[in-house]
Curated annotation (Swiss-Prot):
Composition bias, Basic and acidic residues: 81-92, 99-117
InterPro entries: Vfa1
Protein name: UPF0589 protein C32H8.01c
Disulfide bonds: none
PANTHER family, A to Z: VPS4-ASSOCIATED PROTEIN 1 (PTHR28218:SF1)
Region (Disordered): 81-142, 165-187
Organism listed in the record: Schizosaccharomyces pombe (strain 972 / ATCC 24843)
GO cellular component, one term: nucleus
Length: 187
């Protein structure tokens, strides 16, 4: 059975993409090919090298801008639904003043729909361009990423194992990790 690791307070699942020079390339965390892309936390406690192609994989990391755009679309859809329900309630009450404002609301709704359509068209163009381009470009679409929960747990486990190994090495060097000889003489 898998042992659940407690979430560490010192790590946050918010990574910034940085680029190092060609001389400082190190192996990728996933495929061990030399890469110049580094994901690093705000606190700089955790960093690792990763190929740019892995960042495109939704099973590895999700760009923060994509998460925000999805939540914004959900919020706008909820607001539109509320506006429509208010319009239905206004029609039921039959207030003449509110019926004069209805054409303006319809114009606003069509403008919102156009904005949503243009945003979805932009997302489709981004998705098609990212899937069609196979080589790494120097311009990145997003500089901030959230790791997939399993990858993030791997990073936490890596640091926990590293801390345990350092503690064991310290105890062995100081001699406190070994049992002491008996203080009483043997019979």
């Amino acid at each position: 059975m898998l042992k659940k690791m407690p979430m560490s307070n010192k790590f946050e699942n918010f990574y910034t993409l940085r680029q190092v020079s060609e001389v400082d390339k190190k192996p990728c965390f996933i495929c061990y090919k030399p890469t110049k892309w580094v994901l690093i936390t705000k606190t700089k406690l955790d960093f690792f090298y990763v190929c740019y192609n892995h960042l495109q994989d939704r099973g590895f990391a999700t760009p923060i801008s994509v998460i925000k755009s999805v939540t914004n679309k959900i919020d706008t859809n909820k607001l539109e639904a509320k506006d429509e329900s208010k319009n239905v309630e206004k029609d039921a009450t039959g207030n003449p003043q509110e019926s004069k404002q209805e054409p303006n609301l319809e114009v606003q709704q069509t403008e919102k729909e156009k904005d949503v359509d243009s945003a979805s068209a932009e997302n489709e163009s981004i998705n098609s361009s990212s899937s069609s381009s196979k080589e790494c470009s120097t311009q990145t679409q997003s500089k901030h990423y959230n790791l997939h929960r399993d990858i993030f747990q791997m990073r936490i486990r890596y640091h926990a194992n590293r801390a345990a190994a350092e503690k064991t090495a310290r105890l062995l060097q100081s001699g406190q990790g070994l049992p002491s000889p008996p203080s009483k003489p043997l019979p």
